[in-house]
């Protein structure tokens, strides 16, 4: 095939492409390599541990899909599962909203504020 179609999954915070970046910075379609772009709009504050958890979850989801055809549907399912995983990291406090982001829209829910039970009203 001269011009293979690029398969991709795009959610608010996760982009997965069936392809790889070449030396010129172009995305080249591939049936063998997946490229993951996490939080492309920098909506969250990340630390290395949280990023590694996402990469491990991605690897786990891809491994669970091994043997299945590489289709838009299967790629979207992995992307959707990763999006839910990011929500769980946010709810656990392992990542937080980036209040300096270009747009603050709280797409995964309004931040929760801890209330100190010892405070007197």
UniProtKB/Swiss-Prot annotation:
The entry's keywords: Membrane, NAD, NADP, Plastoquinone, Quinone, Thylakoid, Translocase, Transport
GO molecular function, a single term: oxidoreductase activity, acting on NAD(P)H, quinone or similar compound as acceptor
Membrane topology annotation: Peripheral membrane protein
One GO term describing the cellular component: plasma membrane-derived thylakoid membrane
InterPro entries: NdhM
Catalytic reaction(s) noted: a plastoquinone + NADH + (n+1) H(+)(in) = a plastoquinol + NAD(+) + n H(+)(out); a plastoquinone + NADPH + (n+1) H(+)(in) = a plastoquinol + NADP(+) + n H(+)(out)
Subcellular location: Cellular thylakoid membrane
TM ranges: none
Entries under Pfam families matching the protein: NdhM (PF10664)
Primary location class: membrane
Disulphides: none
EC number: 7.1.1.-
Subunit-structure text: NDH-1 can be composed of about 15 different subunits; different subcomplexes with different compositions have been identified which probably have different functions.
Task performed by this protein: NDH-1 shuttles electrons from an unknown electron donor, via FMN and iron-sulfur (Fe-S) centers, to quinones in the respiratory and/or the photosynthetic chain. The immediate electron acceptor for the enzyme in this species is believed to be plastoquinone. Couples the redox reaction to proton translocation, and thus conserves the redox energy in a proton gradient. Cyanobacterial NDH-1 also plays a role in inorganic carbon-concentration.
UniProt cross-references to HAMAP family, sorted A to Z: NDH1_NDH1M
Family: Belongs to the complex I NdhM subunit family.
Protein name: NAD(P)H-quinone oxidoreductase subunit M
Source organism of this protein record: Nostoc punctiforme (strain ATCC 29133 / PCC 73102)
Gene designation per UniProt: ndhM
């Amino acid at each position: 095939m001269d011009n293979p179609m690029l398969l991709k999954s795009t959610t608010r915070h996760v982009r997965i492409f069936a392809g790889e970046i070449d030396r010129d910075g172009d995305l080249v379609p591939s049936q063998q390599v997946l490229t993951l772009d996490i939080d492309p709009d920098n909506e969250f504050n990340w630390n290395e541990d949280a990023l590694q958890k996402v990469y491990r979850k991605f690897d786990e989801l891809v491994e669970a899909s091994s043997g299945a055809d590489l289709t838009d549907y299967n790629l979207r399912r992995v992307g959707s599962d990763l999006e839910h995983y990011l929500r769980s990291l946010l709810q656990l406090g392992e990542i937080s909203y980036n209040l300096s982001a270009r747009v603050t829209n709280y797409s995964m829910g309004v931040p929760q504020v801890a209330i100190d039970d010892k405070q007197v009203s």
